[in-house]
Amino acid sequence: MRRLLALVLSLAGLVFTANGYRPVSKQGYLAGYAFGSGVFASELPTQAIVTQLAALAVVSPRLSARVRAITWLVSVLSWLGLLGLRRTGRAADQPLTAALDAGLGPDRRAESGDLWKRPAPGGATAKKPGAARMLRIYRDYAHDADISYGECGSRNHLDIWRRPDLDRGGRAPVLLQIPGGAWMTGNKRGQAHPLMSHLAELGWVCVAINYRLSPRSTWPDQIVDVKRAIAWTKEHIAEYGGDPDWIAITGGSAGGHLSALAALTPNDPRFQPGFADADTRVQAAIPFYGVYDFTRSDSSMHPMMVPMLQKHVFKVKRREHPDEFRVASPITHVRQDAPPFFVLHGTNDSLIPVEQARSFVARLRETSDQPVVYAELPCAQHAFDIFGSARAAHAAVAVEQFLAEVYASRPASTSVGLTKLAPS
């Protein structure tokens, strides 16, 4: 029994690693395993090696020489695979750079130092990227927390991320972060920390929001709250050192969907009940691994997605109310005057197939007059940016470079003073 258990554990480790290269399934409940194990294998491969090694060290002394040799051989194959995933993650700057060059041109800006980066001597709080950093990063930057932007209690709260030495009288560019969670879970804390901490350290003001969730709330409550948060930010962010005239929006998964939809429906009264006159325009959008078309039934839509949406989010059948799903799809609202977009998606996404991003980007490029950048990241799973992995750090730098190019191209009327950081 002990021998069998050891062999099963070593083979399970090999399957875990292989799933990081090619998900075992993108349909049904197995997709959940493919996502859960895949994101750990691809984003935390070193930790996975240590875990597998520790487990093998515990059981190995009790095995016969033959079984021990087999389990070690299988485990070594798994570790070599994990080292390959580590190498792919650390090289994620290559597809990101290629995407930026293709979308913005090879003469694009490579950094943003002369635009808004004004670090005061000794005032920086940035630390080296890493998973451990993410455990403490919130307290370094989220100095204004649980601010109300609406009337729905904690679901209408937001946090403001900034450097503690940021001049509140300045006009820092602003990033609005929309959390994901299948429109039913998710919180302003715990997502996009690598990106927000990177930009906050450079002198940005970042706003992370909560919004109403299903099944307690029903679509379009989620996008209404996002729009209300944009309106609040435009009205109040100057009090915290932000520029109300320059706001970019981002989010992952459901947040990717909501950020894209918000960017493509500025001032749309259907999504602004009671505040139709509020300005909800944004200057750029950076959706991560989002859903962009709810009307499809092919391989671009996870087979469990539509039943979940019908039962818990929209609470109507798609075949009976197709317009509700069509209007909720960002691809429906692609327009010539869309803001610049930077779309990021992993090739191995088991929850939202990469085909969603491909078709959305194709429509944007056909229609929009503004730059459209698309980065497809090899071996990246859903939620690849949650941990402080090398891939997440590269993605944060790429987003900075994209925003630097867009910010530098802003109309002269909006360039009212560059961000300055106060002396520490």
Regions found by a protein language model. Name each.
Residues 1-424:
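Alpha/beta-hydrolase superfamily serine-hydrolase fold, recognizing
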